[in-house]
């Protein structure tokens, strides 16, 4: 490495965040990048550790340790330190075709497995370096459209333009196959466009990449709902292969009394309405579900729940509570959660930070669930009965069960962010592919039960991270390519 003692001499530094009180005034990204010299110094913190777990992508204890894309992290960290930004960009995109997405929305599995983090408590700022590299790549022209030099004559349809779909389409196109992508929404991006709010991923970032993909020869057809508006038979007849990348979008519901009250929404529907209204009219059309002037109850403690908290605060809610079924995680790793496992520790994300700044308390209520929704005479939700939970072993299984303690809260808007139960079934039914008991499309190495129909991403593996969707797209592209050509060089 360029500076073997860098991790001892230089402190970890990340991008500056706009204060919560200021950033909630708009839906813009709120991270201010480091100066170039500061970023290069962060590259020097990468150790010559011998075994770089940061790029391993191993599964330990059922969770990923290190980057699933096997990014060449020590290489481009050192290149950042040396100021060799062009080569850093080339080495980055050698394994990750979409670093502008992962550097904004990935939870940084690489940093959790960083040896420097284990040794000093402060991992290398890998995610920040990644973002600096990719933005340099765009500004310098290092990242630009490179159409394939020749075409194979094969045609592939990709259903869904989320991260897995974009990943598989990009590689198959570069191989020379003619790729057409179908998207049921009005904009390309899937989860990236409408499932992640603008302050985490501004949508011009997606549009910038899509322009390159178009210039490279990929065709995008929006407002095309395959399985309804576009028949499966049409795609199978007109293409040599079809790849299903429709995500895991069937939300888990809360089946309790009062669920039929007005003012209760699934989180993804809420977030979609807000982002679409923002992009269409800067909210002038009044079509966004709004939390303005309302007391909001968010059910679910994951990333989507946090996004709902941040969005509701930006809309002007007057109060917010977030329910989490599980106990509060510890502040530091428990003895049974050793490095390089993913740290199961308490994390206060941007939405919770903003709630603390606005309302003086963390919005999360751990070990709770909804027992009943209350509604007024007009049928509008006006409150909820909350049950406290505890962890117990029941019939040999540990689960969260009611303690008997209950309390009521007022709420005018309820957002259900309780996870997903697999993919929406109509696309799978249209293609006649087998399903798993968990509601995902069954496969053998990404091939479904139907000839020349493949599947990847959350539609295959279930709800997951963007980085895993990109990995799935990369792996699936090689399988599809081999099926078309008899061999693959992807």
What are these regions (language model features)?
Residues 87, 150, 155-159, 207-256, ...:
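Feature captures the FAD/FMN-dependent oxidoreductase FAD-binding
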Residues 5-32, 41-44, 70-80, 90-92, ...:
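Beta1-alpha1 glycine-rich phosphate/pyrophosphate-binding loop at the start
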Residues 40-44, 48-56, 62-148, 214, ...:
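Glycine/serine-rich phosphate-binding loop and adjoining beta1-alpha1 elements at the start
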Residues 260-293, 392-463:
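FAD-site-proximal beta/loop scaffold in flavoenzymes
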Residues 305-308, 315, 459-487:
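A conserved FAD-binding loop/helix module that cradles the flavin
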Residues 12-34, 42-45, 366, 374-375, ...:
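C-terminal catalytic lobe of FAD-dependent flavoproteins
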Residues 151-161, 292-302:
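Beta1/beta-strand and adjacent pyrophosphate-binding region of the FAD-binding site
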């Amino acid at each position: 490495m360029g500076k073997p003692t860098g991790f001892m001499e230089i402190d970890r530094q990340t991008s500056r965040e706009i204060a919560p009180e200021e950033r909630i005034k708009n839906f813009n990204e709120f991270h201010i990048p480091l100066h170039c010299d500061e970023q290069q110094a962060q590259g020097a913190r990468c150790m010559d550790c011998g075994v770089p777990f940061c790029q391993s992508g191993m599964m330990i204890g059922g969770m990923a340790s290190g980057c699933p894309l096997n990014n060449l992290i020590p290489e481009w960290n050192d290149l950042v330190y040396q100021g060799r930004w062009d080569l850093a960009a080339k080495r980055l995109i050698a394994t990750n075709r979409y670093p502008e997405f992962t550097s904004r929305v990935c939870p940084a599995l690489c940093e959790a497995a960083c040896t420097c983090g284990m040794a000093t408590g402060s991992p290398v700022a890998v995610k920040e370096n990644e973002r600096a590299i990719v933005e340099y790549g765009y500004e310098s022209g290092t990242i630009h459209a490179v159409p394939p030099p020749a075409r194979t004559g094969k045609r592939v349809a990709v259903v869904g333009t989320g991260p897995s779909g974009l990943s598989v389409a990009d590689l198959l196109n570069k191989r020379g196959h003619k790729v057409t992508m179908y998207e049921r929404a009005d904009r390309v991006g899937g989860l990236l466009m409408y499932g992640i709010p603008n302050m985490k991923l501004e949508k011009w970032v997606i549009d910038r990449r899509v322009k390159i993909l178009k210039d490279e020869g990929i065709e995008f057809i929006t407002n095309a709902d395959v399985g309804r508006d576009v028949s499966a038979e049409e795609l199978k007849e007109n293409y040599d292969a079809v790849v299903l990348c429709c995500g895991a979008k069937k939300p888990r519901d809360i089946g309790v009394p009062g669920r039929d009250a007005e003012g209760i929404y699934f989180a993804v529907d809420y977030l979609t309405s807000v982002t679409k209204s923002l992009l269409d009219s800067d909210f002038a059309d009044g079509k966004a579900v709004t939390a303005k002037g309302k007391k909001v109850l968010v059910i679910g403690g994951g990333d989507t729940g946090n996004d709902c908290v941040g969005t509701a605060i930006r809309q002007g809610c007057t109060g917010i509570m977030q329910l989490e079924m599980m106990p509060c995680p510890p502040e530091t790793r428990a003895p049974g959660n050793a490095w390089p496992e993913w740290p199961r520790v308490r994390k206060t994300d941007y939405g919770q930070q903003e709630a603390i700044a606005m309302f003086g308390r963390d919005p999360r209520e751990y070990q709770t669930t909804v027992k009943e929704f209350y509604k007024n005479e007009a049928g509008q939700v006006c409150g909820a009965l909350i049950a406290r939970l505890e962890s117990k072993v029941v019939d040999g299984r540990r689960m969260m069960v009611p303690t008997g303690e209950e309390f009521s809260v007022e709420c005018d808007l309820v957002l259900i962010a309780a996870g997903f139960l697999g993919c929406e079934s109509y696309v799978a039914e249209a293609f006649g592919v087998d399903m798993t008991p968990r509601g995902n499309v069954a496969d053998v190495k990404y091939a479904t039960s139907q000839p020349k129909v493949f599947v990847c991403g959350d539609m295959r593996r279930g709800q997951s991270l963007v980085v895993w969707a990109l990995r799935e797209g990369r792996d699936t592209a090689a399988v599809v390519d081999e099926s078309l050509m008899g061999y693959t060089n992807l």
